[in-house]
Structure formats: C-alpha cells, structure tokens
C-alpha cells in the first residue's frame, strides 16, 4: 500500500510539474521576461506589471512553492513591476518564495542567495504625507530609489531590503533583518534596523 501511494504521489507530482512549466513559460512570454540559460523554477511564479523590464540570468534557481522550501515560508515568488521599474537578476543566483517589487530598479548580482520569504522593495508604496494618503487610489508622492545587491551576497530568511539600499559583495544579512542603507562588502549585518556585527575574514 505504501508503495502504491508513493507511485501515485510521484505521478501527480510529475503532472503538476509539467503544468507549472507551461504556466511559467506563458507568464514569461506575456510579460516579456528575458531569460538566460538553465533557469530552474520549482512551483509557479507570480508576475505583475506589463511595463518595465525583468531580466533573469543564467543558471538561476527560483523556488516558488511551499513544497520546494519547507521552512515556513509558503507564499509564491512574486515579481511586481510598478510603472517602468526594472528587476535584474544575475547568473548563478538562487531565491526561495521571495517578493521583489520595483518602481525604480532592483539589481541583484551574480551568485546571490535570497533566503525564504525575503522581501525587496525599492518603493514606499505610499506617500509619507497624510494628505496625499487620504486618496488610497493615487500614487501621488510615492518615493522610490534603486536597490543594488552585489555579487555573492547572502540575504537571510525573512529579511526586508528597503529602497535605496546597497548590499556589498559577499556580505551576509542575518535572518529577519531590515536593511535601509548601505552595507559595505565582506560584512555581516543583522537586526531591525540592521546593524554591523563583524567583518568576514
């Protein structure tokens, strides 16, 4: 009986994987996503925004399923473009159930790892002026600044990277941290707000 159940689960999983591949390919075509070689996607990616640009490099792995990363982050990977925003993802990068929202630009280098549930927003979404916020249907006063994550950086699970942030090459951001500013290369930062912990030797 256990073997029968195992075989049924395997067959259902294969069908589901095929459907996900078709779904993602249609999404990429519709949203004109530029894709490099050997992209691997586990689950379905959600994309929003018909303007702007999304570029995915070579040998990128994207997990977008509760089954792909069983550590408590069950949302799908989301690429959300506001206006002419840009999301650029370098080669040999991996991410799991992340949310990237760009009004300006999000640039992710080569060899970067984004842990489960990481959120990267280059926009405030709403104005800090309460008068402008009274009309929830307007984006008036919404501010945005580019985000840069340099090569080989590692962003720990549950972290949030806010507008204007720069994460230096090879630096590590501890889990559940909030970054709003510049993290130099070869350093470990953690906390809310994220603070310097130590250099990486």
Question: What residue ranges belong to the model's regions?
Answer:
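Short conserved catalytic/interaction loops centered on acidic-Pro-aromatic/His motifs
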Residues: 123-130, 167-170, 184-186
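Conserved beta-strand positions that form and line the central face of beta-propeller blades
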Residues: 178, 188, 196
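Domain-scale signature associated with acetyltransferase and cell-envelope carbohydrate enzymes
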Residues: 1-121, 150-152, 159-161, 169, ...
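Histidine/lysine/aspartate-rich catalytic loop segments that bind and position anionic ligands
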Residues: 109-141
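A short, glycine- and basic residue-enriched loop/turn
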Residues: 146-147, 164-165, 180, 186
């Amino acid at each position: 009986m256990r073997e029968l159940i195992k075989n049924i689960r395997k067959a259902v999983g294969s069908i589901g994987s095929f459907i996900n591949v078709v779904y993602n390919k249609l999404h990429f075509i519709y949203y004109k996503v530029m894709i490099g070689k050997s992209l691997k996607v586990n689950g379905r990616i959600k994309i929003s925004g018909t303007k702007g640009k999304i570029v995915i490099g070579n040998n990128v792995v994207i997990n977008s399923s509760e089954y792909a990363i069983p550590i408590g982050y069950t949302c799908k990977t989301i690429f959300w473009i506001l206006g002419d925003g840009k999301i650029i993802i370098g080669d040999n990068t991996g991410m799991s159930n992340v949310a990237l929202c760009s009004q300006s630009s999000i640039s992710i280098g080569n060899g970067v790892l984004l842990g489960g549930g990481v959120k990267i927003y280059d926009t405030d979404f709403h104005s800090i002026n309460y008068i402008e916020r009274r009309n929830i249907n307007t984006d008036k006063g919404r501010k945005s600044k580019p985000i840069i994550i340099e090569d080989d950086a590692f962003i720990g699970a549950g972290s949030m990277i806010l507008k204007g942030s720069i994460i230096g090459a090879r630096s590590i951001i501890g889990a559940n941290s909030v970054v709003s500013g510049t993290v130099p290369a070869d350093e470990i930062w953690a906390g809310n707000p994220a603070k310097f912990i130590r250099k990486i030797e």
